[in-house]
Every structure is written in C-alpha cells, then in structure tokens.
C-alpha cells in the first residue's frame, strides 16, 4: 500500500476492499451531522484559512470543526481524531473557444462549496472547481470523493451531509423562535383624546405615585402610570391597571421600550401583550414621532444621505486618491452587514502593544491550551483575530503582472485580501440581543462590551484592559448643608459633553438655519451645510463643571435635597479613551446627532483634572442610608419582604435600558453596584443575565432588627451580617482579595460604596492580606479565580501616571444616529495616518480629526 504525499495530491490507488478495510478502525469516530450541529466548512477555527487558501481546509468528521494546513496537526494531537474531509477550491483559467474568446458560460457542476467568488478575478477568464477528499491521519492517506461504490455507507452519508450542511452563522429555528404576538382588536378603532398631552423623552414618573420605573403610557389619554405584574414580570403599585378599570382605556405602551422597530404594548382588556399595527400613529398623537425614526433596508435613513453628504465625503476622504496599504498591521476587515462598528473598534484595539502582546504574543500558548471547541473560547478568537490583522498574511498586494505571465490553464493562486470576522462576531455577541443582530450599533457600547469580556477572560499575568482603567473621584455636595461625600469608581472612558453654547460661528449657524427652513418650505435643495465649531477647551470645561443630582437624599438632612456632583481623575490611565457625547434625543423623541467640529488636540494635558480629595474646611456627609419604605400594596409573591426605596441613579438605569436590557434588571445592576455608574452596572448585567430572576423586580429582604431600625445599608443583611456574594464578587473583580472584600463589607454594614472607601482608607490591611486569602475562595467564585490569583494587594489594577497624552487614533461616525450610518477608523502608524474603512486600508491624506466620535490617546512618558 503506497503512502500519499503529505498535504499533496498523491493519493494511493487501492481496491474497494482495501478502502473499506482502511476505514474500519475509524468508523466509531465518524458522525453524521444532526440538526443543531455547527459545521465549520468555510473557515479555520484558529486562522482565516478557507477552502480558497493554498492548503485548503480540513473538516473533522467528528467535531465538524475546520482547520487550515498550519493547525490541523494541533487538533489531531489534542483529540486523536484521524478522519478529515479536505475541501479545496481551485481557480482555473478558462480554455478559449475557436474564435479566440472564452467558451460560453454554463452551469459548473464542479461547484459545491458555499463560498464567495474572488472579486479580483474576471469570471470571463477564470472559473472555479471544488474538490473534496477524505484524509486519514497520521499517514495522510487520501481518498477522492465521490466514491460511493468503494466507501462504506456511513462515510458516504456523513460526507454528503457535511457538504450540504448550512452555515453555522445562520440562526437556527429553535434559537430564533419567539412567541408570535397577535394584533389587538382595539388597535384599529382606538379612540385618542385630544387633550394636548405631550410626552417628553425622559424624566417620567407615575402620575399617582413617585415610581420612576415600569411606567406605562395609556394610548387613549396619555396617562403615565406604574404597572403591576404584567407580562414581563415587572412590578409596581398597579396604577395603570386601576386606571383601566376606572376608564376602560384598553391599550398601554411601556416607556423605555420604544424603538424604530416598535414597542411593547399590553392590552388590559385582552389580558396579554399584543401588536399595535398603528403604534406609530398612536405615539405621534402624544408627540412621539416614530415615522421619522424608521430605518431603510440598507441601514441608512433617507435624511442620512442628503444633508450629510459632506460628512460622508470628509470622513471617508472621498475625492482624494488614496494609496492602498498592505502588510502586517494593514489588514482590512469585511463588513458582515452593519458590522463596521466592530471593525473600527477591533482595529483600534489591536494597534495597542499591550493587546498585541497579550493575544498575538501568547498565540502558541493560547492555541495549545484552547478547549476542544476553540470557536467558543474568547481568548482563542481574540488571538485569531489579532494574528489575522497583524501577521500580514491576509494583506498582500495584487500580483497582476504575474497573473498575465501565467501559463494557459495553469492554476491561479489568488491572494486573500482582508479577513471576515464572522466567527469572532458570532461568539462575542452570542449572549447579547443587539450585538448578535445585523443592526447598526454604538461603537462605544461595543467597546465596553469587549472590555467586559476581556476582564472576565484573563490571559497571562497581565490583563490588557488595565491600560484603559482609571479611578474617578466623585464629589457630591448637599447644597443646603454644604457637606460633601467623596467616592471613587472605576471607569474606562472619558465622556466629554459637547458645549454647543460655546460655538465660535453662531452667526453663520443662525443664517444657515434660516436658509434651511426657507428651502424646506419652498421644497428647494438645502443650502451648503454649516457645521458648529466648538473649542475643545469649552468641552473640557463643561466636563469639569458641577452637575445637578436628581432626587438627591442628603444624609445630613435625612431628607431629599438639591445636590451637585463634580468628577475628577483619581488616577490617569495609560491609554485615555475619549467619547464625544454627540448623540441625544430631541423633544420629539427623534434620536439626533450633534453635527459639530471640535478642534481635538494632537497633544492633550489634563493634569489639572487630578483629584485632590477632602479639602481643609470641608465636612463630610454622615454615613446614613435612606430609610426603608413599605410599599402600598405588599400582597404579592414577595409579601414577606420589604422593598427599600433607595437613591438609585436613574440616569445610569436609563442608559442601560437604552441598550435593550430589561428595566428591572438595570435597576438591580445599578443598586447592587452601589451607584458606581453605568459601566460598572453593565458588568453586573453581563455576569447575571443568564439567571432566571434576571428581569424580576428589585426586592431587598430585611431581617429582624434591621427592619425596625428604619435604616439599612446598601444591600440589607441577615442576622449574621454575611455579605452578599454578588457584592463580594464585584469587589474581587476590581482586583482586591476575597478576605479583604468580606472584611470591608462587614465593616460598612454591606454598603458597597462605603466598603470601597474603607478599603482605600486601610492600606495597611491590603499589605497584610496576601496569598492565604486564596485558600478561602469558594468554588462558586471559580470565574474570578484567575483574576484574584494575579491581583496584587494595592487595589484596583490601574496604571497611574502623568496626565499628558498624544493622539494615535480615532473612530468616526457618519449618519444621524447610532442605529444607522457607518463607522471608519483612523490610526497613526509608523509616523503617518492610515484610514481603515472595512476592507479598504489606505494612507490617509486628510484625517478628519475634528469629526471623530471616539478618540484614543496614549500617555507621553515623563
């Protein structure tokens, strides 16, 4: 029996009996794909090799994972799996006809792989030919397919099923199935009162009580009332239901769920959630204009195209001949359909040396220790993406001159231009409703989602996300007593407000607005756009100014009072990410983007924003929590518990709710993270979203004397004062030892915010608290084990230093809303700016630094 050439086409000729005998030992390992099995026959699990690649793709006949030539041996050594289906697409030059031209087009029966055609090759001159064969390791015996007569039936069936399997990235019916809602019988004939009610886009409150969550807008009279145990499991005082019983007005829409695609509507009469086919008209009656929010099929609104043509041209540097860039670090990424937000963020992330070292530098170790299914491992997919972008393997210049010189009928070996992040996107977004869709997303939200995953999946001794982390000192002052409270929280992004009132071209803006309105009334073409010019210094000043705290509860007065909050940097990050807060909502509920030009500096110094702590003469607010309030109607399944009325940061709650999370889950996230901000609460949501009570109402049990005292800490405690495990986990995730977290929570009556203050005020305990703390870790905390083992005792992992920075990258957005438009990334590499526009990577001639959305700065060494 002759041995085939390694990875070659030298398969041995053998009789039918020999083939059957050869495959007998491997028959138990060969499986036929079933419904629900993911078959990866177009992409390697460790690289971006495909059947188009020179070495083709090897698909395991047991796990259905695909591997390129470079990685197939690794899978064989790890699993012992021997039988693979080798897939290869060949590019053949067409044979010219008698007249000298190519033969007429005909259906190619030799194409059976679901692959895209190479756009660099003309279909008139070249054609494709697909090849499939079985390869048996370790001797690399090759068996050409089809071979029905000689192969066992199981092998033939398995091979055919694998070749005909659908892409794993298409949603399967069981995963995408949702209960189909029926149109309400009241929708078509709903009577709406002409009472002049207009609903603002925020600041809602039940008209019969003080509840600010789980609010429902009655579509007949515009009443805003709280719900009680509706279809989503949310709770309240039931005023919406009482209103229906009094008036008979049947339909209500839940505030916070209104999007361009619809809203959650409930029918009190039909006692179930329903569809309202006329929801846009019904909401418009109260000033909520959804029709203007509708998104076109191509993902762009009509009003994205005409008024902002100049924005698209400037950001993409249209009209300028840009030189394509190739090689390591200049690899483009395919747009999978509104995935430009992901492409832009990942290009910026892998331009940072710490991420390059963590994933690409550790690539052999990450791949060798990857799980049996590497497509479901975060670090493996990060390393794969980083290598794809930085290796230069998928960014090679076209070889047209060599193409012409090729001999007739010789096989052409095309170069792969760019990578398709399909596997990466499928994994990183699988548990996120928005990111798993094909809708456009906010790049800032995706950045935070990515950082959260990096935090939860440590790699090596250093966490690369540490370079973004910094501490924010928040000084809250009671305006009446003048007493203050200092707290610290972790953040990753500096959110910079747009100081529109500081525009330097106000006269031009006023004149433009008048011309625009005149043109609109006369149905003429709009005038040339005039963009507001905002000084960066004004935005920085707006960031540093005090802001009002709504519903502030003063512990000095033990009552609600006016309060103001000021933020400063308790530490400066190694890499500063600055988000320009361009997106907002108008009074008509239409999401708007502030079309501004900000003179972002190449060199930035924010040293003056360094936090100073408690100042001489300042008096701190007492450590007293708000009182417990017993609900009006405790007759529900939680009737034995009390609901604590707390000072929950509603702005953080709404920010999370706008991402698509249930409102009650957002309230719990903000509550359990001690009002430390939306970013910290977002991490809590990701960590708890699989729990069955994720969307249940926030109910804090109070036991024994705690209830009678009238005062309880954040997260009321049991008789033994044992801290809640989720609070312990939050502190551990910030880099502290478990024993120190428990000690701090017990010392502060389980008040998370005060516990962090306590830790910072007891540095001597951090030094004493060392390795022995690792021995008391519960098995439930295995997800934090690596982080805890690597954490040092100095507190949250920060890389403090001078507050002087240099700009090295920015992400720009084109369009009027984060729900539509397009993202582009500019990065400074090797002394020059480069534009990354999906697959197109070119040297930038005029980087539009004044129109960016997210900016990346690196610290200037002192």
UniProtKB/Swiss-Prot annotation:
Could you give a GO molecular-function term held by this entry? Answer: ubiquitin protein ligase binding
* Highest rank taxon of the organism: Eukaryota
Q: What are the protein's UniProt keywords? A: Autophagy, Hydrolase, Metal-binding, Protease, Repeat, Thiol protease, Ubl conjugation pathway, Zinc, Zinc-finger
The reply on keyword Zinc-finger is: yes
Which residues constitute the catalytic centre? 340 (nucleophile), 822 (proton acceptor)
Where are the UBP-type-classified zinc fingers?
182-290
Q: How is its activity regulated?
A: Specifically inhibited by spautin-1 (specific and potent autophagy inhibitor-1), a derivative of MBCQ that binds to USP13 and inhibits deubiquitinase activity.
Q: Give the E.C. number(s).
A: 3.4.19.12
Q: Which GO terms describe its biological process?
A: autophagy; cell population proliferation; maintenance of unfolded protein; positive regulation of ERAD pathway; protein K29-linked deubiquitination; protein K6-linked deubiquitination; protein K63-linked deubiquitination; protein stabilization
The reply to whether DNA-binding figures as a keyword in the UniProt entry is no
Domain named USP: residues: 331-860
Q: Which reaction is catalysed here?
A: Thiol-dependent hydrolysis of ester, thioester, amide, peptide and isopeptide bonds formed by the C-terminal Gly of ubiquitin (a 76-residue protein attached to proteins as an intracellular targeting signal)
Annotated binding of Zn(2+), by residue: 206, 209, 226, 239
Q: Which residues form the signal peptide?
A: none
InterPro entries named in the record: Papain-like_cys_pep_sf, Peptidase_C19_UCH, Ub_carboxyl-term_hydrolase, UBA, UBA-like_sf, Ubiquitinyl_hydrolase, UBP13_Znf-UBP_var, USP_CS
| Domain UBA residue range list | 647-688, 722-762
As for what it does, the entry says: Deubiquitinase that mediates deubiquitination of target proteins and is involved in various processes such as autophagy and endoplasmic reticulum-associated degradation (ERAD).
Assigned protein family:
Belongs to the peptidase C19 family.
Q: What is this protein called?
A: Ubiquitin carboxyl-terminal hydrolase 13
């Amino acid at each position: 029996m002759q041995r085939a050439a390694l990875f070659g086409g030298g398969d041995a000729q053998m009789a039918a009996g020999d083939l059957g005998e050869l495959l007998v030992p491997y028959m138990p390992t060969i499986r036929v794909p079933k419904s629900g099995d993911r078959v990866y026959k177009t992409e390697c699990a460790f690289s971006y090799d495909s059947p188009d690649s020179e070495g083709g793709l090897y698909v395991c006949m047991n796990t259905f994972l695909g591997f390129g030539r470079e990685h197939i041996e690794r899978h064989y050594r790890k699993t012992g799996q021997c039988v693979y289906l080798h897939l290869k697409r060949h590019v053949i030059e067409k044979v010219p006809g008698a007249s000298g031209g190519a033969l007429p087009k005909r259906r190619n029966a030799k194409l059976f792989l679901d692959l895209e055609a190479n756009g660099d090759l003309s279909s008139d001159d070249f054609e494709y030919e697909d090849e499939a064969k079985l390869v048996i390791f370790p001797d690399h015996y090759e068996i050409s397919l089809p071979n029905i007569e000689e192969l066992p039936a199981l092998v033939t069936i398995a091979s055919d099923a694998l070749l005909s399997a659908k892409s794993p990235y298409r949603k399967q019916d069981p995963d995408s199935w949702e209960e189909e809602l029926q149109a309400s019988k009241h929708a078509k004939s709903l009577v709406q009162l002409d009472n002049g009610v207009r609903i603002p886009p925020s600041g809602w409150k039940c008209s019969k009580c003080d509840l600010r969550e789980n609010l429902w807008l009655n579509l007949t009279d515009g009443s805003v009332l709280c719900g009680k145990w509706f279809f989503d499991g949310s709770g309240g005082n039931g005023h919406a239901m009482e209103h229906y019983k009094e008036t008979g007005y049947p339909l209500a829409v839940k505030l916070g769920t209104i999007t361009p695609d619809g809203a959650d509507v409930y029918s009190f009469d039909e006692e179930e959630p329903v569809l309202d086919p006329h929801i846009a008209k019904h909401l418009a009656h109260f000033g909520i204009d959804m029709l203007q929010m509708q998104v076109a099929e191509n993902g762009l609104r009509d009003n994205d195209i005409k008024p902002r043509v100049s924005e698209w041209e400037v950001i993409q540097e249209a009209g300028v001949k840009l030189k394509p860039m190739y090689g390591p670090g200049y690899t483009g990424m395919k747009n999978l359909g509104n995935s430009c937000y992901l492409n832009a963020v990942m290009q910026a992330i892998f331009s940072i040396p710490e991420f390059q070292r963590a994933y690409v530098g550790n690539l052999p170790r990450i791949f060798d220790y990857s799980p049996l299914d590497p497509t479901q491992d975060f670090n493996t997919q990060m390393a794969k993406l980083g290598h794809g972008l930085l290796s230069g393997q998928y960014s090679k210049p076209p070889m047209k001159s060599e193409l012409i010189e090729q001999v007739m009928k010789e096989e052409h070996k095309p170069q792969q231009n760019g990578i398709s992040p399909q596997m990466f996107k499928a994994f990183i977004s699988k548990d996120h409703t928005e990111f798993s869709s094909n809708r456009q997303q906010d790049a800032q939200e995706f950045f935070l989602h990515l950082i959260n995953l990096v935090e939860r999946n440590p790699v090596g001794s250093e966490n690369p996300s540490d370079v973004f982390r910094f501490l924010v000192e928040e000084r809250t002052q009671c305006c009446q007593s003048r007493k203050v409270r200092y707290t610290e929280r972790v953040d990753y992004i500096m959110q910079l407000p747009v100081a529109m009132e500081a525009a330097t071209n106000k006269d031009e803006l006023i004149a433009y607005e008048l011309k625009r309105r005149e043109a609109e009334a006369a149905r003429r073409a709009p005038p040339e756009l005039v963009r507001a010019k905002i000084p960066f210094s004004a935005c920085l000043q707006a960031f540093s100014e005090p802001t009002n705290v709504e519903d502030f509860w003063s512990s000095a007065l033990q009552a609600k009072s006016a309060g103001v909050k000021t933020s400063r940097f308790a530490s400066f990050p190694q890499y500063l990410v600055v988000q320009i807060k361009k997106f907002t909502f108008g009074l008509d509920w239409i999401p708007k983007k502030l079309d501004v030009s900000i003179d972002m500096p190449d060199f930035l110094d924010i040293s003056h924003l360094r936090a100073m702590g408690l100042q001489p003469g300042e008096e701190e607010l007492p450590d007293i929590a708000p009182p417990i309030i017993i609900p009006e109607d405790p007759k529900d399944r939680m009737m034995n518990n009390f609901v604590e009325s707390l000072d929950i940061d509603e702005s953080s709650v709404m920010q999370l709710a706008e991402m698509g999370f249930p409102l009650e889950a957002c309230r719990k996230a903000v509550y359990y993270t001690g009002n430390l901000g939306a970013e910290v609460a977002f991490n809590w949501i990701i960590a708890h979203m699989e729990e069955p009570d994720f969307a249940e109402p926030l109910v804090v049990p109070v036991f024994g004397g705690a209830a009678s005292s009238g005062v309880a800490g954040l997260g009321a405690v049991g008789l033994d004062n044992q801290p809640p495990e989720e609070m312990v986990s939050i502190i551990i995730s910030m880099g502290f030892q478990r024993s120190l977290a428990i000690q701090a929570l017990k010392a502060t009556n389980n008040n998370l915010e005060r516990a962090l203050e306590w830790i910072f005020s007891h540095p001597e305990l951090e030094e004493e608290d060392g390795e022995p703390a690792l021995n008391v870790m519960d098995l439930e905390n295995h997800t934090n084990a690596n982080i805890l083992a690597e954490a040092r005792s100095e507190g949250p992992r920060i890389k403090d230093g001078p507050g002087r920075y240099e700009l090295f990258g920015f992400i720009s957005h084109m369009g009027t809303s984060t729900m539509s438009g397009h993202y582009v990334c500019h990065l400074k590499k090797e002394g020059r700016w480069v534009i990354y526009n999906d697959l197109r990577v070119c040297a930038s001639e005029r980087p539009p630094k004044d129109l960016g959305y997210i900016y990346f700065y690196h610290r200037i060494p002192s």
